[in-house]
Amino acid sequence: MSLLVRPATEVKRAPAIPAADHSRDLKSVVKVLEDAPPIDREYLAPREEFEERARRVNAALQRAGHAAGFVFSDEHYRGDVPYLGGNTNLSIEQVAGVIGKNGFHIAAGLEGGYVAERLAGRAGAVVHKVEILQLADEKYPIKAEHLEQVIEAAAGGPIDHIALLTPRQVIPAGIVRFLESLFGPDGVVDAQELYYRVKYEKSEIEMRLISDAAVIADCMMQSMLAVLRPGRLETEVAAWGAWAGRMLGSEADGFKIMVGANEANRTLIGPALNRPIREGDWVHLGVAPQRDGLTACVRRSVVAVDNPSRATEEQRFWMDLVEQGYQVGEEAYRKVAAEGLPARFQEQTLVDYFAGRAAEVSARVGKRVDLASLKPYTGTHNSGYTECQEFFGAITLDSQEPLGHRIVTMLDVALRGIGDRWNDVIIPGFDYCVVENTLGKDGTTVKCLTRLPVHAQELVGAC
């Protein structure tokens, strides 16, 4: 017998989902879609938007004494090339780009180049096929160009150095070494912050697309909550969110859909897996749909019960604590925006909130708990063509500058019940709870772009 074939008696089959359950779920999700605000699914950022971005980046480069800047993207770090090249349809192969006085030039392998050419024309970007960016060890019958030719084409001639606009943590070391072979180690200059600052400030068109993505995020989350019940797999719940997102016009996601039940809450950001959701489980859910590459996000924690009253008093306590923390964080963000305060005020307010609840929590669990240290991460971060990988704009206790003028911010308030390791249980029976929304700021005005209720428990199985 082949080692690849098992006898039928050894095959463990998952229980079939009754057709009636599928029909009920479909009816629930279709109702969510029918009630969704209208979105123009075919709307894309126009050429003028990309030309203005290129102008702003070139102006920043020139002020810093650089003739050309280098950017890089792949399926995971998707933003830096599409921001200038319009190629939001990244697929499999990595791509790079060079911005200079002659505009934006994309460098890609054969297949990645075809993919880029599908959309790059709308940005006025020129696509070049180069071997250094082709897929792994495959060979392609193309007349490839050299990367140095692409650089000269963008810069308008030979240059003596190039500015790295993408973080070195993202660009493959081999590409950095190749650039150093062209310009020397001192000729590859870190200039990432100037690009960060350009991308940080959003245009009205970007805010429109992010607002559309926020509508989709709400509907995806509402769909998943509607079908969430004990006995479902995490992936089954996530599947309905994915379907709703694509039906409403999201072509990609800032991260894989999150559905984590029971111990999976300890991942904080883990994706849905083929794991059953049990009666009374904590479940964290998260979505980050993109419209024309621009991202919105919403995350919530709920309990898998068929009636909100069946959540335990203990579960309601932790949920209330985090939800109140979110309200404190949003109020502080609005104050920072309205008064032009240093952004750190908002993060300090969150830290102080959790520290102020520490004695209460310590008494509840019967031991001293440093609650502020269980706030797992910075509560507020920048977003755009990635959900949380902008490398700039997160609000920390070191953020002395005020907020930008027109920006998008993810307000992510959470609490964990574990320490530095998976089994380092600090609060028994509680692993993680989160509330995250997408905020838009324009001048002193702040709007929560995602409209799902902060307390989402009543939406579980609600449709």
Could you tell me what each predicted segment is?
Residues M1-C463:
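Active-site neighborhoods and metal-handling regions in enzymes and metal-associated proteins
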